[in-house]
Amino acid sequence: MKWLVGIFAVFLLCLMIYAGSAFVSALGLVSAVRSGDAAQVMTRTDLPRVRHSIIDQVMAAYLDRLGQKRPVRPFERMAINAFGATIADDLAIKLMTPENLSVLLKTGTVRNAAENITLGTMSSLADLDISNIFVFVGRIKLIKPVEFALRLGESQDAGSVSMHLDGTSWKLSGIGLPPKVLTNMVDRLPTR
């Protein structure tokens, strides 16, 4: 019986360390965003994963848009996935510069500063109330044991961020854009 209690206590301790490390990393990211320190935001970001998450969302929204007007044939779907990812990757690279990423997380404005284009807004990470732990925990959705999503607000247009366990710390690994922002991004892509 003592072994069972000991094993359970060790399990609870490991679970608390796991959850605590996620909370501390999220708190560090929010602090870096609030201070406007782009260098700190970038050190707490897995940029290739964030770009990939943007590309996946843009490609899915693009295929949905094409499917609304007419059925997308399998060959078209394959071509869009092959060549469209290049176009979406170019868009994601422009959106995920250190300056644009810092502005997105701090103000919620999705923009391309190089072309002076604003694509929409979402809730900002800087406005997230981390002082109320119960609200914070209520917004977490576990995706995998090493990744979670954090909703930035209550509405669908609020958006979300994902954090991934990278070694011993958690890093920003994705940004869930609201449907309106994705629609604005897809409208800038060619239809053929």
What kind of feature is each model-predicted range?
Residues 2-21:
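Hydrophobic membrane-insertion alpha-helices, especially the h-region
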Residues 8, 27, 190-192:
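Soluble, non-membrane globular domain cores that form compact, hydrophobic packing
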Residues 17, 23-26, 47:
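Alpha-helical transmembrane segments of polytopic integral membrane proteins
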Residues 25-40:
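Alpha-helical transmembrane signal-anchor/signal-peptide segments
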Residues 38-68:
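Short extracytoplasmic
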Residues 43, 139-140:
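Alpha-helical transmembrane segments and their juxtamembrane interface "caps"
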Residues 74-132, 136:
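Structured, soluble extracytoplasmic/luminal domains of envelope-associated proteins
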Residues 109-112, 117-126, 135, 145-191:
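Short beta-strand edge/turn micro-motifs at domain boundaries
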